[in-house]
């Protein structure tokens, strides 16, 4: 299962200007906010969560919320993601991989997932 999302960094900057910290809290967990120190990073996190929901085939909504997807970094700074136990079990997900990049005012994320084998 694969999901991809592209977002304008300018769009995220406008979102932050309008909604501030409260807006960030709607889609980022507290530990993610600590990592998201630049608009580029925030845009990448937004794209990652959207790409993850697309890989699951749901989009963000009742089945999968922004806070069901936890983003963090490995010791070298590469992005990683973890699904909530509820979502992981419901969709029978075994593993997830994430890649995020930024270029010319855009952030893009790709998520690949493998289902558990019977």
Swiss-Prot record:
Keywords: Cytoplasm, Fatty acid biosynthesis, Fatty acid metabolism, Lipid biosynthesis, Lipid metabolism, Magnesium, Metal-binding, Transferase. GO terms for molecular function: holo-[acyl-carrier-protein] synthase activity; magnesium ion binding. Its main location: cytoplasm. It catalyses: apo-[ACP] + CoA = holo-[ACP] + adenosine 3',5'-bisphosphate + H(+). GO terms for biological process: fatty acid biosynthetic process. Belongs to the P-Pant transferase superfamily. AcpS family. This is Holo-[acyl-carrier-protein] synthase. The gene is acpS.
């Amino acid at each position: 299962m694969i999901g991809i999302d592209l977002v304008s960094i300018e769009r995220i900057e406008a979102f932050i200007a309008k909604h501030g910290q409260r807006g960030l809290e709607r889609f980022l967990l507290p530990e993610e906010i600590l990592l998201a120190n630049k608009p580029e990073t925030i845009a990448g996190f937004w794209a990652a969560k959207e790409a993850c929901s697309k890989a699951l085939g749901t989009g963000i909504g009742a089945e999968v919320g922004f806070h069901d997807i936890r983003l963090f970094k490995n010791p070298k700074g590469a992005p990683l993601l973890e699904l909530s136990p509820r979502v992981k079990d419901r969709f029978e997900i075994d593993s997830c991989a994430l890649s995020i990049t930024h270029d010319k005012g855009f952030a893009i994320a790709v998520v690949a997932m493998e289902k558990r084998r019977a």
